[in-house]
A protein has these predicted regions:
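Solvent-exposed loop segments of extracellular immunoglobulin-like
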Residues: 94-100
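N-terminal secretory signal peptides
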Residues: 1-38, 45-55
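C-terminal edge beta-strand
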Residues: 147-155
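Proline-enriched interdomain boundary motifs that mark the N-terminal boundary
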Residues: 66-75
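Conserved small-residue
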Residues: 25, 155-834
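Acidic, Ser/Thr
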Residues: 88-94
Length: 834
């Protein structure tokens, strides 16, 4: 209002107009303010939420039309967890010396470029729709501030890509908007002075080249020091990966050779070929980095390393020094040579890598007469060797183990690298005179420090001996003993859990003596085996000497001590009554809930007569090309919830997350999960959850399923699927009738909620491959995947795949295929899958 001037009394309170400047009145400011508009200048795309628009003034003097600025900052927008959100502000009038974005509400996010007009952030993980609020501020040349607010509503994470169709093409296919880079191939050199790979069978020196059959894999961020971990390193790191096996035919100019007979039937292998084949097994440690355009590996890095069946090993834990580990090479049973058939893996929070020895038994030769030499068929060692599949040959047969390495006659007669594959008793004295105990040196979990090339890998015997597929640690909670979950990958074998004797301490995640931390958590604890009941409950049965039937009085196998129990974990599981499963493969733990998932890849020996609640299907899966697969042909994924959600629990509940099946198979008894053309799969194998350092591992994590299949390959090559699973018990019970071989049997199983659109196909691989091994950078924006044995059914004169040479386009002439690691990135830089 105007101040009155017609005062009639002598009183003077000083309230008179002495301001003769040209500055505006309040009415002028109001007029200025209400002449402006709030506008929305953008929206949401599939990958990015962009918020623009309206304005709000912080104070009336900020509307000074000569000195103030007017800013616009956006109306409400919406997005989902993991998406990149762009906030765009504008200066609608006036001149600003600075602008800034700030968050004022909701779960805290990190604003990139907050002191510019355009700021970005990654939408956080949420369990329900959640609103975040932000303020955009502009400051005039006279220091007057103007600000306005906007909001973004974030919904829970969802898969946001179009499912990749099934395919028989010889190429890696990914969704639109994603790119594939081939990173690390069989034969790639990893040291200075090693030549490029010729890929014609002539190459040697695989101790300094990439091995074959890339499998389980972990990424470790590398700090600027070049030798220490960086848990947040997204552009430089160490990639550690297994080389499970070989495609023998492609490693030599004209395939593998032998003299005096066929390989595996008395033929003698050349030493040079056998050495190459051995060196192609094992593990790679390589440094990788990301430039502005792509990922590549660093061929001359000092951290590059191959670990092979020739690498010195150390034993740790309860079996170290046991008589059954003593050999001609290690007379005190504390050391060994090499690791082999390394399948899945484990990534430890103290930055070490666990590699796991799977199908190791087939590499050994055991000649006729060895059973008698060890005391007859009922002698303990013979019972043990038979239970692990190491049987003597028939009288008229000479089997030299997988690839015939035991047949090699080395140029150096003192060289025992090949003789050790013969576990026949030959010495007149004890086991230190031959390699009768060499098989007991395999079947273990092996821990590697990737940051120390001089370190000796340690075989962790407290985790038991079996066909170790993988070893996945559960959630680590301060003061709680961590658990490590494992599958024994063979038909009708068991699921195991090791609970450390030591409660978790968060400080150990940054310790510099990494293998010593492994000693702390992995050398002492309790190994358990799973028993699953028909009512959906289950128990972890302890493999502890002296408890229950695990004593020297046991008639199946008289256990001598705890070391004997661990060496013979399968026999211990037998007498405890563990549940036989349909080939337990990879394990993975949901980082948000702690629930453990395990792939049961398939089981050709499952019959209608022996189905049970946790392995409820036996059926015929016909092939379009003729023939059929029987048993549990397509496999399933089971999951367990620990009682009290604690890793220390000895009881659990379970259900089956999803059943593999073709979408065209019987929906009542086979395709129980209601799979369709976007997500039907067969033989689940690799399994991994996104990391909790990004939205794929928080609140509603993304689970990745890889396949290793033979039943559905008439329809599609192997694949990678993404899923956002629920929780144990989110479905119900289901009666399932199996009909096979003239027998029918009905059991009631527990099945999770049908996945529908929360499960979809993300990748299809090239011909004759397995999709296996998966990990990501901490930010979830680069996904590493292994393509194993493409073209495995061919050979030098019959090349059945040219991948990866043809990934960028057709090749003029066929190229020998190479197992390889690929990197998948999103073209807009976003988080993979979301």
């Amino acid at each position: 209002m105007k101040i009155p001037t017609n005062m009639t009394m002598a009183y003077h309170d000083g309230d008179i107009d002495t301001n003769t400047s040209a500055n505006p009145h309040l009415n002028d400011l109001i007029a200025v303010r209400y002449s402006r508009r709030q506008t929305l200048m953008g929206g949401l795309s599939a990958a990015t939420a962009a918020v623009f628009g309206g304005m709000l003034l912080a104070g009336c003097d900020e509307d000074d039309p000569r000195r103030a600025v007017t800013v616009q900052a956006g109306a409400s927008g919406a997005t989902s967890a993991g998406k990149t959100v762009t906030l765009t502000g504008t200066v609608a009038s006036g001149s600003a010396t600075g602008v800034a974005w700030a968050q004022t509400g909701g779960p805290a996010v990190t604003l990139a470029n907050a002191n510019t007009a355009t700021a970005t952030f990654t939408a956080p993980s949420v369990a329900a729709d959640t609103t975040l609020t932000f303020t955009f501020t502009g400051t005039s040349t006279d220091g007057i501030r103007s600000e306005t607010s906007t909001s973004v509503t974030v919904s829970p994470a969802r898969l946001d890509f179009t499912a990749v169709p099934k395919s028989l093409a010889d190429v890696v296919a990914v969704p639109a908007g994603y790119s594939v880079t081939v990173l690390y191939r069989l034969g790639d050199p990893i040291a200075t002075g090693v030549g490029a790979y010729a890929n014609d069978g002539s190459d040697t020196n695989f101790a300094r080249r990439a091995g074959d059959h890339h499998d389980g894999m972990s990424y470790f961020g590398l700090a600027a020091t070049g030798s220490t971990p960086d848990a947040n390193g997204n552009t430089r790191g160490l990639l550690v990966l297994n080389h499970e096996n070989i495609t023998q035919a492609y490693l030599h100019p004209n395939g593998a050779t032998s003299t005096g007979g066929a390989i595996g039937a008395g033929g003698v292998r050349p030493e040079s070929e056998a050495l190459k084949e051995m060196e192609c097994h094992g593990v790679s440690v390589i440094e990788i980095s990301r430039s502005a355009t792509a990922w590549s590996y660093v061929p001359a890095s000092a951290l590059n390393r191959r670990i092979t069946p020739l690498t010195p090993m150390s034993f740790s834990g309860p079996v170290r020094g046991n008589a059954l580990l003593r050999t001609r090479y290690s007379t005190d049973g504390t050391a060994g040579r090499g690791t082999i058939n390394n399948c899945a893996n484990g990534t430890m929070p103290w930055h070490t890598y666990l590699t796991n020895e799977e199908n190791w038994a087939g590499y050994f030769r055991r000649q006729f007469g060895d059973v008698a030499a060890r005391g007859g068929s009922t002698a303990k060692q013979n019972v043990s060797l038979a239970r692990y599949g190491i049987r003597e040959t028939a009288n008229a047969t000479t089997f030299n183990g997988n690839y015939g390495w035991a047949s090699v006659v080395p140029a150096d007669s003192a060289n025992t690298l090949y003789a050790r594959w013969n576990v026949t008793t030959t010495a007149a004295t004890d086991a230190t005179g031959d390699f009768r105990n060499e098989a007991f040196q395999y079947g273990w979990v092996v821990e590697i420090d990737p940051f120390d090339p001089a370190s000796t890998p340690r075989k962790r015997t407290a985790l038991g001996r079996m066909n170790h597929e993988g070893c996945e640690i559960g959630r680590t909670i301060a003061g709680v003993k961590p658990a490590f979950y494992m599958g024994d990958d063979a038909q009708n074998e068991y699921i195991y859990k090791f609970v450390s004797a030591t409660p978790w301490s968060a400080a150990d995640a940054t310790a510099t003596n990494r293998l010593a931390i492994g000693d702390k958590y992995l050398d002492s604890g309790t190994l358990y085996v799973a028993k699953l009941n028909a009512d959906g409950s289950g128990q972890w049965l302890p493999l502890v000497f002296g408890q229950g039937p695990l004593t020297s009085a046991n008639t199946t196998y008289p256990f001598a001590d705890q070391a004997d129990v661990l060496i013979n974990a399968r026999l211990a599981g037998d007498v405890l009554g563990a549940t036989k499963m349909d080939r337990p493969e990879w394990t993975a733990v949901n980082p948000a809930t702690g629930e453990m998932y395990c792939t049961l890849t398939n089981n050709s020996s499952r019959t209608a007569a022996n189905v049970d609640a946790s392995n409820p299907r036996a059926y015929t899966d016909p092939k379009k090309t003729g023939g059929q697969t029987t048993g549990n042909a397509n496999g399933h994924v089971i999951r367990l919830r620990e009682t009290g959600d604690t890793s220390e629990a000895t009881a659990f509940t379970w259900d089956i997350y999803a059943f593999g099946a073709g979408s065209d198979l019987d929906a009542t008894n086979i395709n129980l999960s209601g799979l369709d053309a976007t997500n039907d799969f067969s033989s689940p194998d690799g399994l991994w959850f996104g990391l909790p350092s990004n939205p794929t591992g928080n609140v509603t994590p993304v689970m990745w399923i890889e396949t290793d299949d033979g039943a559905y390959t008439d329809v599609t090559n192997c694949m990678l699927l993404a899923a956002i699973p629920g929780r144990v018990g989110d479905g119900g019970t289901r009666a399932v009738t199996s009909t096979l071989g003239g027998t029918s049997n009905t059991v009631t199983t527990r099945i999770g909620k049908a996945p529908a659109t929360t499960l979809r196909r993300f990748l299809v691989g090239p011909k004759e491959c397995e999709i296996t091994g998966i990990h990501s950078t901490p930010d979830g924006r680069s996904l590493f995947v292994n393509i194993q044995h493409p073209g495995e059914n061919g050979g030098p004169t019959n090349i059945t795949s040219s991948w990866p040479a043809n990934q960028a386009g057709a090749v003029a002439t066929p190229s020998r295929p190479r197992s390889s690691t690929i990197v998948i990135t999103k073209n807009d830089g976003g988080i993979i899958g979301l």
